[in-house]
Design a protein with these regions (language model features):
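Hydrophobic alpha-helical connector segments
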Residues: 72, 87-116, 173-176, 198
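Amphipathic alpha-helical segments used for helix-helix packing
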Residues: 113-134, 185, 189
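Short coil/turn segments at alpha/beta junctions that flank glycine-rich nucleotide-binding fingerprints
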Residues: 37-41, 117, 160
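Short, hydrophobic secondary-structure boundary micro-motifs
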Residues: 122-124, 165-166, 196
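Amphipathic, non-transmembrane alpha-helical scaffold segments
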Residues: 20, 28, 70, 74, ...
Length: 216
């Protein structure tokens, strides 16, 4: 399915800043789709131009090259995920029940990204990692930032007494995030993403708070 809008007739000079941003986002939207379908190395500017029904020259007024477009696409994805991850106050919960509800809210919002836009998973977990060391480092830094943010929730639970005193918060936070991102990858690849989301949502919650031992 092609992006419906096109950029035909763009003026060369005197564009309003809001129009420049709008057109950049159009290019990024189309580029994300093409990169996720063909991969970075198999994609060229002509493929993205074809998706938008524009000439090659238009691109070079907004982006220097394919690499810059790719980095911008990944940057936008990281912003979207970051907005969800930072959408709750780590210190707001005062009991285990409140924390479980908070985790479920965050999980629902985060997993919804992968349901609504499976290209996010493709870009983050495949194309970015496979590009080069510089891009892998950017994604690695993102993972580290999310890990530190997740740790704040665990520190709050220890401080207020509803999580174990001996909990290794840093390692546990990274383990939780690994599970969450693997869930997102699986959701995005599923033929029934809504069903897969529910399965992984319940699995993550149960594993975090009840473990795998038989309940007495």
């Amino acid at each position: 399915m092609r992006v419906k809008r096109n950029l035909a007739g763009i003026k060369k000079d005197g564009e309003r800043p809001d129009l420049v941003e709008y057109r950049r986002r159009q290019i990024l939207q189309a580029a994300k789709k093409v990169f996720s379908e063909k991969g970075y190395h198999q994609t060229n500017i002509a493929d993205i131009a074809r998706e938008l029904k524009i000439g090659h020259g238009t691109f070079y007024r907004y982006f220097k090259n394919k690499r810059e477009i790719f980095e911008s696409v990944v940057g936008e994805i990281i912003k979207r995920v970051s907005t969800v991850v930072s959408g709750e106050d780590p210190g707001a919960t005062n009991s285990l029940d409140e924390y479980i509800r908070q985790v479920r809210r965050l999980g629902e919002k985060l997993f919804a990204l992968f349901v609504e836009d499976p290209t996010i998973a493709r870009m983050l977990f495949y194309e970015s990692w496979g590009l080069d060391e510089e891009m892998r480092e950017k994604v690695w830094q993102m993972m580290g930032t999310f890990g530190r943010y997740t740790e704040l929730y665990l520190v709050n639970g220890k401080k207020k007494g509803f999580l174990r005193e001996d909990l290794e918060t840093e390692a546990t936070a990274l383990a939780i995030n690994t599970l969450i991102f693997e869930s997102g990858r699986r959701i995005a690849k599923s033929g029934d993403r809504e069903k897969e989301k529910k399965t992984w949502m319940n699995t993550v919650i149960n594993l975090m708070f009840h473990g795998i031992k038989k309940q007495e």
